[in-house]
Each structure stands twice: as C-alpha cells, then as structure tokens.
Amino acid sequence: MSTIQPSVLRRQAGDMLQKAPYDPKRLVLIHTSVALGASLLVTIVNYILNQQIAGTGGLSGMGLRSVLSTVQVVLELAILVGTPFWEFGLLFAALRWARGEKADFQNLLQGFRRFGSVLALRLLRGGLFILMGIAVIQLSSTVFLLTPFSKSLLEVMEPVITAAGNPQQLEAILTPELLVSVMEACIPLMLIAGALYALIALPVFYRLRFADFAVMDGAGAVSAMVQSVRATRKKSLQLVKLDFSFWWFYLLQLLCVAISYGNIILPALGITFPFSEDMALFLFYVLGSLCQLLLLWQYQASVLTCYGLAYGAFGVRPPTPREQSLPHTATWNA
C-alpha cells in the first residue's frame, strides 16, 4: 500500500479489534487504570507528606523533613521514569492487534523488557530535539537583534545598561514593571523562535514517528530511528493527514487535561469554590482522571491500531533474528 487512507485504516482497525481474542478495550482499561492509579496514589502520598513536612519545625525536625522530601522525590522520579516504559507496552499491544495477533496483560510489560532500547531511543531522540532547540535559540536571537523587532527591547534595557556601574541606581531601576516590559519586548523573539523550531522540528518529528513501533518490533534504538526515517521518506504528509483525522481525540485529551487543572483555570476566570483549595485540587484531579479513563477506554485501542496498521503499510518490517542481534543495523523493506 503506497498511500494510506485514514477511513480505510479505521475500518481495518475495527475489524482487527473485533477479531481480537482478548478484549482490547479491557486491556486499555487495565493499562490506563494502572497508570492513573499510580499517579493518583503518588499525588495523595505527596499531599500527606507535605502536611507532615509542614508540621515539623526547627532544627529537631530537620532530619525528618529531609527524609520525607527524599521520599517525595523518589516517588515522583519513579512515576516520571516508569510511565514511558509502561506506555510502550500498549504500543506493543497495538502492533499485535494490527497484525491480528493476541495481546494480553503480559504484553503491557514489553516496554520494561526492552528497557535498554527504549531508554536509548528516548535519550537519542530527546537529545536531538534539545540540540535543535539550542540551535534555534542562537539563530532566532541573531535574527531578532538584526531586525527592527529588537528596538523595543533595546529601549527598555537602555537605562539598565547606563546604570550598570551604579548599584544603587540599578537597584532602583530593577522593578517588577521593568520585568513586565522586558517580557513584552521579547514577544517577537519568542514568536520567531517558535516559528523556526516548528519549521525545523516538525519534519524531524514525523520522520521519527515510527521509531517507537520499530523498537517494540525488536530493533535497536539507532536502527529504529533509521528505519523510521527511511520508511517515512516522502510520506510524512500522509502521517499528518492521519493525525488530523483524529483531531477530535486529541482535542478531548486536552479537555481532560484542562479539567484536571480546573482548580487553577476557574479561579483565574473569576469563579470561586465553596470548598477549600485542597479539596478543589483533589476533586478536579479525580474528575479529569475519570474523563481521561473513559476517553482512552473507548477509543485508544482503535487509534493506536490505526497507527500500527500505518506502520505496516509504510513498509517497516520486523527485523530478522540475525538483525535483532545487531541492533545498530538499519533495516527497511524498500
């Protein structure tokens, strides 16, 4: 298949999921419940620990505060580090659904079984985007300073530069109002940087879009990136079209996130609550999590299976046993 059609993929995904031996929605429900449950548990424990830390004062409580703070950091790191590997397990399940194979709870642990390759892929890809960000900052700063857009910033900073040798005068100038003026003057810089980063990073993002599936297919990190780049050559726009066909799904995900932060968003709009801030935090977090659980339970299996079908349609094939023993060998079915 040289061209993918979102409507065809959705129909094929529906057929595959109906024939699945183990209910895909049930598997997604288990996967999402574990992820949201762990996050909720850590949030509750952190709240309790914060109350304990606030109740310890003076030098006598310093040791206890240090221990409790360490526990908080460890719990947050565990969620931060573990969640991506858990998410990769569902990608592996989606790949099996797309191939008409059985996927069960054991497959959700595949991300941890492929720990080294998944970690290497995330580090390589993250490092690549960080380097692009640094390059964009340098380029956008140069463009900003060499154009009339920087005039406002130079005018705002002129008194600061003039008073650089006078600490008292400098202290009088450095006010919150000056900071606001600097931020407003930097808006063109941020717009230039955002536009340049999107121009550079988006094509790279789509060329590497199938690297996650390739890693779950047995490839090494470098091999997965190379396979994805080759398979999406001249086909990235098809992936963009596929993404846009699921606009409603991503919009509902954003809505779930917005609900989770309702305790911040609604007061900013002038809406007050008849209960405490802590209660508002807990209620909106639980409500947002429940909305996300329902959304993913209903639709995520279908969406991920569509991407799994696209992965196969783009000609990214599973590596042979010999290629799996050589994780840095690029493979691609031309």
Would you name each region that the model predicts?
Residues 1-334:
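Hydrophobic alpha-helical membrane segments
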